[in-house]
C-alpha cells in the first residue's frame, strides 16, 4: 500500500482516526525475542493460536516486525513449496512516514490474523508507532507484536514496548542474553511510566537444559524470571514443527499459560501458613484435581510453601496424603526435630524438615517445577517480604518455615530470612502482581471466635469427665507435672507462647488477604494446637470438606467469561479488517 493511498482516504477516516481507542487490560502485548537462536515466529504463532483458543470469539492479531532488507518470508529457511499463509504474509504496510491499514489481513487456520510490517531503519518515529497501535487497538481485542531485539535496542522496539500494556522478554540461559535484558530494561525505565513488572523475562530452556543459575543472575541484574518455556526447540528445529519431537506437550503448555495470562484466565492458588493445620491444603488440592480444575500458579507461606512446592514438583493429592501420613504416630514428629545447642538464635535448625522435603523434590530448582511457584519469607534485617522465584526450591522453603524464636533464621546469599507467615500469611497479592486474575485462597489459620469456641468445648468436655476416670492418674499429673516441666511443646510453655504470639499477628493479615481473593476457603479448624502433626488425616478431611462446599463457586470462577470488549468493525476499506 502506497503513501498516496493513505493520504487519499485520510479525510474519510478523520473521525475514526482521531477517536480515542478503548484502553483494555492486556490489550497490546510485545513479544521481544532477545536471542536469535529462538524460533520466534513459531513461538509467537503458537502463543497467538493459544490466545484464540482461550478467548473464543475474540479477535487476535499478530503483528510481525521485520527489517525491510529481508525478503518477504520471515522464516528465511522455509522452502517456498512448504511455506504457509503465516510464512508468506503480504508486507504492504511500510513503517515510514505514515501508516495505513491494509485492505485485508491474512486469517490463519488457528483463528488469528497476521500482519507483517517492514521496518525501515530509524524512520519509525514514536508518533507513527503510536498511530499504528491506536488503529490496532480499535480493531482487535488482543494485539501481539513480535520483534527481534538487536544487541542495541532500536528506537522502534523501545517505542513498541512503551506503547504496550505488557511485554514478554524471551531469552535463553546465556550471559549475552542476560546482558541484553538488563540493557533493555535500563533503557526503558526513563521512558516508561508503567511499573517494571510490565516487562517480564521469560527464560526458554531446551529439552534437558537446566537454568544453571541464570535465573538467579537475571533476578540480580534485572528482574525475577516471570515464567519458563521448557523443551523449547531451536530456531532450526522450529522450521518444521510437524517433525517428530518438534513441539512437546510441555512446550505448548508453557506457552498456553502465557496466553491465559494475557486473556485474564490464569488461576492461582494461595496457601496459608498454619503449621500442622496446613495439612488441610492437601484436601483442597485433592478436590481440585478430582474435578479437573487446573491451577496455573501457586504461592505459599510457611507450611503452605512446603505443600505448594511438593505439588508444583508434580506429586498429586493422593501421593501428598501418603507423605503426610508418614507423620502419624506419637513419636514421628521427632524425626524432624533437630535441636541446636546452645539455642542462641533458635532451638531447632530446621534442616531435618528440609531434608524431608528433599526426599520428595530432591535438589530441584524453580525452573524444574511443573507449575510456577512463589515462596514467601521475611527478611530479618530489613523486615520486608521476600518472594523466592529462582534458585533451589528446598532452600527457599527452609527459609519460609523458619519460625522466629523457635527455628534458627536461614541465611541465603548473605541475607537472613524467617518464616514467611510473619510478613504475608496468605500471599494473595503476589498472585495479583504476577497478573493472575482468578484466585483461590486457603486460610488454615483459625480466627479468635473459632478458638474461643474450641476452648469452651474443651472446658465442657473436661467438666463432663471430672466425675469419672482414673482419679489417681489425674492427681499424679497435678502433683508431678512432668508434661509441663519437660515438654517445651506443651500448651502454655515457651514454644506454644511464641507460636500463639505469631498467630495473633497473622489473623488480621490473613483475613485482609482473603478479601483480595475471588474465593476464600477457610477450613473448619477450631483448635489452635499448632504442632498436631500426629493426625494429618483429620486436617486433610477438613480441607476436602470446605473445598467441596465451595465447589460450585470455584467452578463458576473458572468458567467466568471476561467482558466482551469487541467493537463492531467499520466498513471503511482502509480500517476494516477482513
Language model features with spans:
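Extreme N-terminal, non-catalytic leader segments
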Residues: 1-37, 244-266
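Walker A/P-loop phosphate-binding motif and the immediately C-terminal alpha-helix
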Residues: 20-75, 131, 136, 303
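Phosphate-binding loop that captures ATP/GTP phosphates
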Residues: 51-118, 133, 324
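Conserved catalytic-core segment of NTP-binding enzymes
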Residues: 131-132, 137-143, 147-227, 440, ...
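Non-catalytic peripheral regions of patatin-like phospholipases
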Residues: 204-207, 211-250, 317-356, 360, ...
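Helix-rich "cap/lid" substructures immediately adjacent to catalytic or cofactor-binding pockets
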Residues: 246-298
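Catalytic nucleophile loop
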Residues: 294-313
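A short alpha-helix-loop-beta-strand transition element characteristic
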Residues: 361-372
